């Protein structure tokens, strides 16, 4: 989805569960 996860992603991975990387920001699905 659109809400951000409050983190940036490195190497295309996000630490927060159910979040995906749209560099440089992680978004909830």
UniProtKB/Swiss-Prot annotation:
Indicate what this protein is called per its UniProt record.
Cyclotide mech-3
Q: Which InterPro entries match?
A: Cyclotide, Cyclotide_moebius_CS, Cyclotide_sf
Q: Which cysteines are joined by disulfide bonds?
A: 5-19, 9-21, 14-26
Q: Provide the cross-link position: Cyclopeptide (Gly-Asn).
A: 1-29
Functional description taken from the UniProt entry: Probably participates in a plant defense mechanism (Potential). Binds to and induces leakage in phospholipd membranes, particularly ones containing 1-palmitoyl-2-oleophosphatidylethanolamine (POPE). In vitro, displays cytotoxicity against cultured cells but no hemolytic activity towards fresh erythrocytes.
PTM: This is a cyclic peptide. Contains 3 disulfide bonds.
Does the keyword Disulfide bond feature in the UniProt annotation? yes
Q: Name one GO biological process term.
A: killing of cells of another organism
UniProt free text on domains: The presence of a 'disulfide through disulfide knot' structurally defines this protein as a knottin.
Similarity-based family: Belongs to the cyclotide family. Moebius subfamily.
Instruction: Tell me if Repeat is a UniProt keyword of this record.
Output: no
Which Pfam families has this protein been placed in?
A: Cyclotide
* Record keywords, A-Z: Cytolysis, Disulfide bond, Knottin, Plant defense
The source's domain of life comes to: Eukaryota
